[in-house]
Amino acid sequence: MRIKTRNFIMQTQQILTQLFDNQPLSQEQAAFIFGNIVKGELSNEQLAGALIALKIRGETIDEITGAVTALLAAAEPFPAPDYPFADIVGTGGDNADTINISTASAIVAASMGLKIAKHGNRSVSSKTGASDVLTALGVNIRMSTEQARKALDEIGIAFIFAQQYHLGFKYAGPVRQALKTRTIFNILGPLINPANPKRQLLGVYSPELLKPYAETNLRLNHEHSIIVHGCGLDEVAIHGLTQVAELRDGKIEYYNLSPKDFGFEPQPLESLRGGAPEENAKILTALLQGKGSEQQAQAVAMNTALLMKLFGHEDIKQNAQQVLEQLTTGKAFETLTKLTTY
């Protein structure tokens, strides 16, 4: 930890006072404070106070954007490719304990020729997060940056494990665990992929998050983002309406999608229940081999259909049918098998 200058102390105190007075921060102020949080420059008491003040008032777009830019600047670098690539990620926190739909969709999309740099972490709120199920499937989630980029180039998918790139998060860990409540860090997770993709399918646990994420991605110059909330899920829903915020070419459009828009009938959410990592790994293995249930295949088809839209495949009904056909070939399982060799 560096010696704190008088200027640093005054600036930090001014920002904290502003937060405690219920005043919003500018993007620059948010970048300053979060840049210093991940350097370990704030005391636990200061950090706890800042996080609670932000949570109680509600984080602004400026604050989220400033925090994202600071955390990306502090992250270990990932060499982003020149070709188009996307991320598919969820906030978690929907408490539904479904199978890992986003992870399966990422693998299927890669087997169809799309490039997916999937950013993820260990589960906090569900039984099995992306990294938990991938580990159970035999994937080395701690592959080096070079290996991850090689996998992205060669087989179309890389897993970027958050803990390996955001080393400064350790400074916030004890406070976050002590608070035992969602903070701005839960909002930031899906936005801080170090590969910095400009295309993203993002699932959120609450419909109230659609607008903040869409507007933040607009500020972050995303080319095409689709943010979804599906009837309580941070995925596209097989059991009801999905609320959507789509950012494209600097404009945000809000609309709803039903299973019928993808060519399907609604299915019960219960059919997607998962469990521990080993159980979810077995389900995903069968699914990627074309031996999953109709409902599981439908969930992956609907989510992958929107992922395909980010790459210019506009007809989501046609996309969903292509995904179902792809699942029957077993090629998605081949892609997973290749991923385990990196």
Curated annotation (Swiss-Prot):
Residues annotated for anthranilate 1 binding in this entry: 90, 121
Binding positions (Mg(2+) 1): 102, 235
Origin superkingdom: Bacteria
UniProt keyword DNA repair, yes or no: no
GO CC field: cytosol
Chain positions recorded as Mg(2+) 2 binding sites: 234-235
GO annotation, biological process: L-tryptophan biosynthetic process
Residue numbers binding anthranilate 2: 176
Gene Ontology molecular function terms on file: anthranilate phosphoribosyltransferase activity; magnesium ion binding
Keywords: Amino-acid biosynthesis, Aromatic amino acid biosynthesis, Glycosyltransferase, Magnesium, Metal-binding, Transferase, Tryptophan biosynthesis
Residues binding 5-phospho-alpha-D-ribose 1-diphosphate, per UniProt: 90, 93-94, 98, 100-103, 118-126, 130
Record keyword Transmembrane present: no
Cofactor requirement: Mg(2+)
Reaction equation(s) it catalyzes: N-(5-phospho-beta-D-ribosyl)anthranilate + diphosphate = 5-phospho-alpha-D-ribose 1-diphosphate + anthranilate
Enzyme Commission code: 2.4.2.18
InterPro entries in UniProt: Anthranilate_Pribosyl_Tfrase (IPR005940), Glycosyl_Trfase_fam3 (IPR000312), Glycosyl_Trfase_fam3_N_dom (IPR017459), Glycosyl_Trfase_fam3_N_dom_sf (IPR036320), Nuc_phospho_transferase (IPR035902)
Cofactor note: Binds 2 magnesium ions per monomer.
Pfam families: Glycos_trans_3N, Glycos_transf_3
Pathway of action: Amino-acid biosynthesis; L-tryptophan biosynthesis; L-tryptophan from chorismate: step 2/5
Function: Catalyzes the transfer of the phosphoribosyl group of 5-phosphorylribose-1-pyrophosphate (PRPP) to anthranilate to yield N-(5'-phosphoribosyl)-anthranilate (PRA).
HAMAP family for the chain: TrpD
UniProt similarity note: Belongs to the anthranilate phosphoribosyltransferase family.
Quaternary structure note: Homodimer.
Protein name: Anthranilate phosphoribosyltransferase
Organism: Mannheimia succiniciproducens (strain KCTC 0769BP / MBEL55E)
